[in-house]
């Protein structure tokens, strides 16, 4: 299956520090259209991006005036550009700052980058200095370093919009941030992130892997999402509920180790149930904090995985409906 095959590629990426997955311009454009109001007079930092090839940098440079940006910064870990840049491999990481002085427009083929003293890792003191000067971080960080990456954004109290694997929301620290309403899912998830450009040395697995008209090698894992702390109107829309619990109790079995019912699909959440419900993790894509309360993740009262007749469904989030209907 295509999903299984491309997941192998994502697993392969976790073994690489550089995680060479480049985001397509169309996916960036599709997501960023919902956040335009946040960028006026802001400094945007893409801290995992070679400015000469990054579509994140390109998007913000092209839309610099439309968004009303103050400054755009991109920085790159030295290995990120291997296989993507036509120039000689740099000895150090590098960065580029763009603020459109004197009305000059950026020529992408003529970007003169500045070198770091070190490798340009996002955790380096040089990269952190740029982070401190920025307002909003937007990028596709290395999957293998996701926890450290998110921790850093939280530590420095930065606004952000980043790409992550769907399974990242099962991390305890990530779920807690979502539960505390400090971060949330963006607009697009799964097939809403259409694919990633990969270098020549990556094998193209699965029926959804392809080479586009520009010769880019693209894989489509269909299991990625956007995480952010930029508010967007869509997350405040109520999830329409059409199913009922009463009269259909057999469709909603109770857990062995928690006083809650199991709901296999988000669309099957009953509108008339007053108690706690266990729902799939992808529910968070539809989560409206005014409509639902997040109770707990995955575990029962015995701190073991939630189970039904001794069998454990895939990770569940325990929730409660704040707007009960009859």
UniProtKB/Swiss-Prot annotation:
The keyword DNA-binding applies. The gene is ecoRIM. This is Type II methyltransferase M.EcoRI. Monomer. Belongs to the N(4)/N(6)-methyltransferase family. Keywords: DNA-binding, Methyltransferase, Plasmid, Restriction system, S-adenosyl-L-methionine, Transferase. GO terms for biological process: DNA restriction-modification system; methylation. It comes from the Bacteria. Its EC number is 2.1.1.72. One of its GO terms (molecular function) is site-specific DNA-methyltransferase (adenine-specific) activity. It catalyses: a 2'-deoxyadenosine in DNA + S-adenosyl-L-methionine = an N(6)-methyl-2'-deoxyadenosine in DNA + S-adenosyl-L-homocysteine + H(+). Disulfide bonds: none annotated.
